[in-house]
């Protein structure tokens, strides 16, 4: 199943956030609330010209609407909620 966002929206596959550091320290949920989320852009809307499919981006943690296609979960975000491209 395919989804094409309209206007200035993007479809993002969110990366799983780890609550444990590389050294094994567990970070409580309330300690990382202000940290932005990251994900990969899967599809871009018809009016998006500054990002493209495949870009890894940072976005506000609680932004967007969840969408399930098949067995995968995605987020639909307004382009203005994307904070930047991670290179």
UniProtKB/Swiss-Prot annotation:
Keywords, comma-separated and alphabetical: Chaperone, Cytoplasm
Keyword Chaperone: yes
UniProt GO molecular function: ATP binding; metal ion binding; protein folding chaperone; protein-folding chaperone binding; unfolded protein binding
One Gene Ontology cellular component annotation held by this UniProt entry: cytoplasm
Main localization category: cytoplasm
Compartments, as annotated in UniProt: Cytoplasm
GO BP terms in the entry: chaperone cofactor-dependent protein refolding
Superkingdom of this protein's organism: Bacteria
Family membership: Belongs to the GroES chaperonin family.
Quaternary structure (record): Heptamer of 7 subunits arranged in a ring. Interacts with the chaperonin GroEL.
PANTHER family: 10 KDA HEAT SHOCK PROTEIN (PTHR10772), CO-CHAPERONIN GROES (PTHR10772:SF58)
Protein's name in the database: Co-chaperonin GroES
């Amino acid at each position: 199943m395919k989804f094409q966002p309209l206007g200035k929206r993007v479809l993002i596959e969110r990366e799983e956030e780890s609550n444990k550091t590389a050294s094994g320290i567990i970070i409580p949920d309330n300690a990382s609330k202000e940290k932005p989320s990251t994900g990969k852009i899967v599809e871009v809307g018809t009016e998006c010209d500054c990002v493209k499919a495949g870009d890894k981006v940072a976005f506000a943690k609680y932004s967007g609407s969840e969408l399930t296609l098949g067995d995968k979960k995605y987020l639909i975000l307004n382009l203005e909620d994307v904070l930047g491209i991670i290179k």
